[in-house]
Curated annotation (Swiss-Prot):
Annotated compartments: Cytoplasm
Sites where the protein binds ATP: S27, G28, G29, L30, D31, S32
One Gene Ontology term from the biological process aspect of the record: tRNA modification
Annotated domain remarks: The N-terminal region contains the highly conserved SGGXDS motif, predicted to be a P-loop motif involved in ATP binding.
InterPro entries to which the protein is assigned, alphabetical: Lysidine-tRNA-synth_C, Rossmann-like_a/b/a_fold, TilS/TtcA_N, tRNA_Ile_lys_synt, tRNA_Ile_lys_synt_N
Stated name of the protein: tRNA(Ile)-lysidine synthase
Principal localisation: cytoplasm
GO molecular function: ATP binding; tRNA(Ile)-lysidine synthase activity
Cellular component GO terms held in the UniProt record: cytoplasm
Function: Ligates lysine onto the cytidine present at position 34 of the AUA codon-specific tRNA(Ile) that contains the anticodon CAU, in an ATP-dependent manner. Cytidine is converted to lysidine, thus changing the amino acid specificity of the tRNA from methionine to isoleucine.
Length: 425
């Protein structure tokens, strides 16, 4: 295919119709380098201002040289380029999160509203097959979205209908680690798919067909259920349990960055069935609110806010509260800093005790009232004790007791730290 053919496809799809500035995720591989060539050549026709963003993962000897070459390329094209270096222990998941956090920073800094990536049909096949092996929910087997709105930005993948063989051989960097089978995606690409294609030469097309069919079903269900108010539990529970699950999953599609696991989805179902009133964070900055026969899922405000008896602290925020400085994911320096492992996926609640509070320690549930009696905690200290809560469970009673955090809590691994420092009131 020729470059004008790709331009015509982009124009027909109207990828950039709503955008004046776009950030291109430039890895240096063939797919992203060719996308760079098309977008930079046809900026005028597409009516966009192009901005480049590259992450140097520091995993190969060549990576620093490649970074220099990309800087030269950007200078020759008279385009701005932003570069960040990955540090710390490497994993596919950590690298992916690092990249997208960086891309969002660049977009915020430049005022861009579109993030463009060079994912293509071969990536789509690998992604769907990986998710199938991992046992993911059916809706995710539709694969990578061609266009995806996340908050105030749109991720655009204009090559998703093309295979890598459709791209001309142009100057690019070859990542030799792609030939190694250390990572799951590489094993899919290098071993599993070639073996399965021996059984069915059109196996890749079959996988893409399944993904498209699931997407059709998903869109059809959303259209057919448009007049059903899922948030009205009386209406939701009037259907069979199978239909309830499908309607609830369709409702959750409104929140693309929520991404509940099967276990978390089942937990939400149980809350809706058996809790009369409920309000707690669930995941990724969302909270579930239930009041008798009504419920809703909504984003928590990004700022920490202090209520009458409770404070809500969000990831990468700090707040001083009742003689302590609480820092969620931002390290504090000092000799007397208390550290509590927590999850960054949802907010932390800091409050005083309530009737019926329970602490889970070493797998056993114990009422706070009994714990305070056993530890002979004075009444004044019981009333002033600060409770740290996440996922609806007590993580710690500050200065008194801490939950057993060596296990997964609410299906989410403890992946950051709450730092606490005693300060003067």
């Amino acid at each position: 295919m020729r470059e004008p053919d790709f331009l015509n496809h982009f124009l027909k799809k109207g990828y950039f119709k709503k955008h004046a500035k776009a950030v291109l995720a430039l890895s240096g591989g063939l797919d992203s380098m060719f996308l760079f060539k098309v977008l930079s050549t046809y900026q005028k026709e597409l009516e966009i201002e192009l901005i480049l963003a590259h992450v140097n993962h520091k995993q190969r000897i060549e990576s620093d040289w490649e970074e220099k070459e990309l800087r030269k390329l950007a200078a020759e094209a008279e385009l701005p380029i932003y570069i960040s270096n990955f540090s710390g222990e490497f994993s596919e998941a950590r690298a992916r999160n690092f990249r997208y956090d960086f891309f969002q920073e660049v977009m915020k800094k430049t005022g861009a509203t579109a993030l463009v990536t060079a994912h293509h049909a071969d990536d789509q096949v690998e992604t769907i097959f990986m998710r199938l092996i991992r046992g993911t929910r059916l809706r995710y087997l539709s694969g990578i979205k061609e266009k995806q709105v996340v908050g105030e930005i749109e991720i655009i993948r204009p090559f998703l209908h093309f295979q890598k063989k459709d791209f001309p051989s142009i100057f690019h960097f070859e990542d030799t680690s792609n030939q190694e089978n250390h990572y799951f995606r590489n094993r899919i690409r290098n071993s599993y798919l070639p073996e399965l294609e021996k059984e069915n030469p059109r196996f890749r097309d079959a996988i893409l067909g399944i993904g498209n069919e699931i997407l059709d079903y998903d869109l059809a269900i959303a259209e057919l259920s448009n007049n059903i108010n899922v948030e009205d539990l009386q209406q939701l529970f009037s259907y069979s349990e199978s239909t309830q699950r499908v309607l609830l999953q369709t409702y959750l599609n409104r929140f693309p960055d929520l991404n509940l696991t099967k276990a978390q989805f089942a937990e939400v179902q149980q809350i809706l069935k058996f809790k009369s009133q409920y309000r707690h964070p669930i995941k990724n900055g969302y909270e579930l609110i239930k009041e008798y026969q009504q419920f809703q899922i909504c984003k928590i405000s990004p700022q920490a806010d202090e209520k009458e008896d409770e404070l809500v602290l969000h990831y990468q925020n700090q707040v001083a509260y009742q003689g302590y400085l609480f820092s969620f994911g931002l390290p504090l320096e000092g000799e007397l800093i208390q550290q509590i492992p927590v999850s960054r996926e949802t907010s932390i609640h800091i409050r005083h005790r309530k009737t019926g509070d329970v602490l889970i320690k070493n797998g056993h549930r114990k009422k706070l009232r009994r714990l305070f009696i056993d530890l002979k905690i004075p009444m004044e200290k019981r009333n002033s004790a600060l409770i740290i809560e996440q996922f609806g469970e007590i993580v710690s009673i500050l200065g008194i007791a801490t939950n057993n955090l060596s296990k997964k809590t609410k299906n989410d691994i403890m992946n950051t730290v709450l730092y606490i420092e005693k300060i003067d009131r």
